[in-house]
Amino acid sequence: MKIKSLLSVLLSLAMVISLFSLAGCGSDKPEKLKPTNDGDTTTTLSGIDEYKGTTVTFATWVDHSKSEAAATWASFTEKYDITIKTVNIGQWNYVNKLSGLVAAGQSPDIIVENGNFPALFPVAQRLDEIKTFDLKDDFWDQNVINYGSINGVPYFINAVNTPWTFRGCILYNKKVFEDNGIKSPMEFYEEDNWTIDTFVECATRVSKLGSDYVGAFVPLENACNIFGVKLVEYKDSKFINNVGNDQVAAACRWLMNGVDSKIFNPIIGNEDFAKFTSGKTGMVAYSDYGLRISGPFRAMDSKDMGYLPMPKVSASDEHYPVSNSLRAYGICKGARNAEAAAYFLRYFLDYENYNKNDVFISEEASDFAFSMNEMNHNPLLGTSNGVLCILDGLSDSAAKYYKTITDSSAAQVATNLKSFSNNIEACVKEANDIIDRVGGNQ
């Protein structure tokens, strides 16, 4: 996903993954697993035969028998005779339900970090002790590994060129702009003039089409991403309340000026997704999840979907801002088939094992999503939302904190940021307590 709405946590990042197989008799050092192309565009994993006939359990809310990964799961089982079984756990109460399974001795093998960071650390195994992972392989995204580590010990991973991370971007309804003779975001981008000011210009012109039009949906966290800043930082295995950062204040003022002017809406829910699809909204600050066949805009004609990077704060900025959801995968404590699960993750997270037409609305949209990997000079990873949800374990509970800002006005931003900072102190403390507890037991 992050890039994520205030009412949901979708949200990462790109990462690469490789595995070790068992070494020869008498050696405790595994041999690096080398994927080879077998001629049908998928990956062959040497050394996997030892796990034939076994089952890997995957805790997720997605029915992958019907998702964009359906063919990938089926081909893995067909090639390697390893069954993948879903353990269904709802997205919004994932942490609490998973913790209950672990406590009851019913641990799945694979777990998903999807906006709950760092609440899943206590139920995750350290990956450096699983012999079929080679975490130094450049298939893995080292940025994700660093975030998914405590005191240098890795717990979570993802791949660089994976379909299972979500990159921040701006989506716009081409038809709204073309039918009304409004200069489009892409035209500004092609002029190298795609900034927060021209974003506002686009939103203003759309909003003037009528009282039922919204210029742009801009969630608070995505406004911060545009300004290159996070509400909660994670550095050196420690969370830091970053609400006092000047750029956070600048992002909030920019957002709330747009709200006050009735050109921005800071909330995105299902009705708002429909408003964009139906042509009553110009732009959405979202992620490339919106370009997926399974995404919230799937009812929209793909020819009407426009997409481009988030705008620069200043035209002179060297780079367009880049953010990724902190989507990552781990092996659960108590997993019964961790080594085979590692092989499956290597296969599942490799975009080469997918048909692009099963994932994105078009090949062009797929190319755009992955082109943002090339822009990842210093991508922001979405860690803030998980910290704000940590006290109750519900993935959508951060919205109540965001309302401290979004339910007010631009004139009140400075005062409201102080309240916001005070309100989340308990969340930051609990997040750091989790890190300390897990780190102390390594």
Go through the PLM ranges and name each one.
Residues 152, 298-363:
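Extracytoplasmic/periplasmic substrate-recognition and gating elements
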Residues 74-144, 149, 180, 282-283, ...:
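Extracytoplasmic "Venus flytrap"/periplasmic binding protein-like
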Residues 201-203, 237-269:
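Glycine-centered hinge/linker elements that transmit conformational signals in sensory
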Residues 153-168, 178, 192-240:
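Extracytoplasmic/periplasmic solute-binding protein
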Residues 83, 338, 352-442:
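Conserved C-terminal helix/tail region of periplasmic/extracytoplasmic solute-binding proteins
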Residues 63-81, 175-177:
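Short, polar/charged alpha-helical segment
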Residues 39-52, 114-167, 197, 308:
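Hinge/lid segment of periplasmic solute-binding proteins
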Residues 131-140, 188-191, 231-250, 299, ...:
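Short, solvent-exposed loop/beta-turn-alpha elements that line the ligand-binding surface or hinge
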